[in-house]
Amino acid sequence: MKTKEDMQELYFPTPKLIEWENGVRQYSTVRGDTEVLMSYVPPHTNVEPHQHKEVQIGMVVSGELMMTVGDVTRKMTALESAYIAPPHVPHGARNDTDQEVIAIDIKRLKADETYTSPEDYFLDIFKTRDLLPGMEVTFFVEDWVEIMLAKIPGNGGEMPFHKHRNEQIGICIGGGYDMTVEGCTVEMKFGTAYFCEPREDHGAINRSEKESKSINIFFPPRYNRAKAKKMKADE
């Protein structure tokens, strides 16, 4: 029988610190086929091009980064775009600024998934709307994945408990809120990640006075399925 600690480690894995010779620090959390990396890139630091069998998607949370995927280089500013590096496609980054950059990268390899990307490997904002009254969300969409930036209002703003057929991962990137997965509740703070498999019950509430922010990833897309289906049909 699983203990409360076992359940918490399943849904909210303890981050493991990875330190690289160039000074980059990464906090890694893993469930199943997916790894979330919260990366801290020092000023004037290069991350040399590399490749691997997993697909990798990423977004800048703070600062700006020159990101290269394949032969395409683009300046990424905080929460304005995302990249997709398909399996075995080289990718690297460069922080040309005087400030530390914080970025989130997600690596995944699942046997039944096909990892497409735009021709230039970068996703721009698809749309911004209110998901619930007072809860603004912004979407980035590819046919197999959907990224949703969410703002949860303070003083009791909540995402009611629900479940769905999609796998869902979330990372707190501002403020804090209580996140519950299958009855296991954790106080989310900057960098905390949760993993929710299909049909696992989950919900969130922000009990603080300040708005909280999170990045949520759905496999496959949940809220923009029509766009994802059209993208697949156009391939």
Curated annotation (Swiss-Prot):
<feature type="binding site">
    <location>
        <position position="52"/>
    </location>
    <ligand>
        <name>a divalent metal cation 1</name>
    </ligand>
</feature>
<keyword id="KW-0479">Metal-binding</keyword>
<dbReference type="Pfam" id="PF07883">
    <property type="entry name" value="Cupin_2"/>
</dbReference>
<keyword id="KW-0408">Iron</keyword>
<feature type="binding site">
    <location>
        <position position="91"/>
    </location>
    <ligand>
        <name>a divalent metal cation 1</name>
    </ligand>
</feature>
<feature type="binding site">
    <location>
        <position position="50"/>
    </location>
    <ligand>
        <name>a divalent metal cation 1</name>
    </ligand>
</feature>
<comment type="function">
    <text>Part of the bacABCDEF operon responsible for the biosynthesis of the nonribosomally synthesized dipeptide antibiotic bacilysin, composed of L-alanine and L-anticapsin. Bacilysin is an irreversible inactivator of the glutaminase domain of glucosamine synthetase. BacB catalyzes the allylic isomerization of the endocyclic-delta(4),delta(8)-7R-dihydro-hydroxyphenylpyruvate (en-H2HPP) to generate a mixture of 3E,7R- and 3Z, 7R-olefins (E/Z ration of 3/1) of the exocyclic-delta(3),delta(5)-dihydro-hydroxyphenylpyruvate (ex-H2HPP).</text>
</comment>
<dbReference type="InterPro" id="IPR014710">
    <property type="entry name" value="RmlC-like_jellyroll"/>
</dbReference>
<feature type="binding site">
    <location>
        <position position="162"/>
    </location>
    <ligand>
        <name>a divalent metal cation 2</name>
    </ligand>
</feature>
<dbReference type="GO" id="GO:0050897">
    <property type="term" value="F:cobalt ion binding"/>
</dbReference>
<feature type="domain" description="Cupin type-2 2">
    <location>
        <begin position="151"/>
        <end position="216"/>
    </location>
</feature>
<keyword id="KW-0045">Antibiotic biosynthesis</keyword>
<dbReference type="GO" id="GO:0005506">
    <property type="term" value="F:iron ion binding"/>
</dbReference>
<protein>
    <recommendedName>
        <fullName>H2HPP isomerase</fullName>
        <ecNumber>5.3.3.19</ecNumber>
    </recommendedName>
</protein>
<comment type="pathway">
    <text>Antibiotic biosynthesis; bacilysin biosynthesis.</text>
</comment>
<comment type="subunit">
    <text>Monomer.</text>
</comment>
<feature type="binding site">
    <location>
        <position position="223"/>
    </location>
    <ligand>
        <name>substrate</name>
    </ligand>
</feature>
<dbReference type="InterPro" id="IPR011051">
    <property type="entry name" value="RmlC_Cupin_sf"/>
</dbReference>
<dbReference type="GO" id="GO:0005737">
    <property type="term" value="C:cytoplasm"/>
</dbReference>
<dbReference type="GO" id="GO:0016863">
    <property type="term" value="F:intramolecular oxidoreductase activity, transposing C=C bonds"/>
</dbReference>
<feature type="binding site">
    <location>
        <position position="168"/>
    </location>
    <ligand>
        <name>a divalent metal cation 2</name>
    </ligand>
</feature>
<keyword id="KW-0413">Isomerase</keyword>
<dbReference type="GO" id="GO:0017000">
    <property type="term" value="P:antibiotic biosynthetic process"/>
</dbReference>
<dbReference type="InterPro" id="IPR013096">
    <property type="entry name" value="Cupin_2"/>
</dbReference>
<keyword id="KW-0963">Cytoplasm</keyword>
<keyword id="KW-0170">Cobalt</keyword>
<dbReference type="InterPro" id="IPR052535">
    <property type="entry name" value="Bacilysin_H2HPP_isomerase"/>
</dbReference>
<feature type="binding site">
    <location>
        <position position="56"/>
    </location>
    <ligand>
        <name>a divalent metal cation 1</name>
    </ligand>
</feature>
<feature type="domain" description="Cupin type-2 1">
    <location>
        <begin position="41"/>
        <end position="106"/>
    </location>
</feature>
<feature type="binding site">
    <location>
        <position position="164"/>
    </location>
    <ligand>
        <name>a divalent metal cation 2</name>
    </ligand>
</feature>
<feature type="binding site">
    <location>
        <position position="202"/>
    </location>
    <ligand>
        <name>a divalent metal cation 2</name>
    </ligand>
</feature>
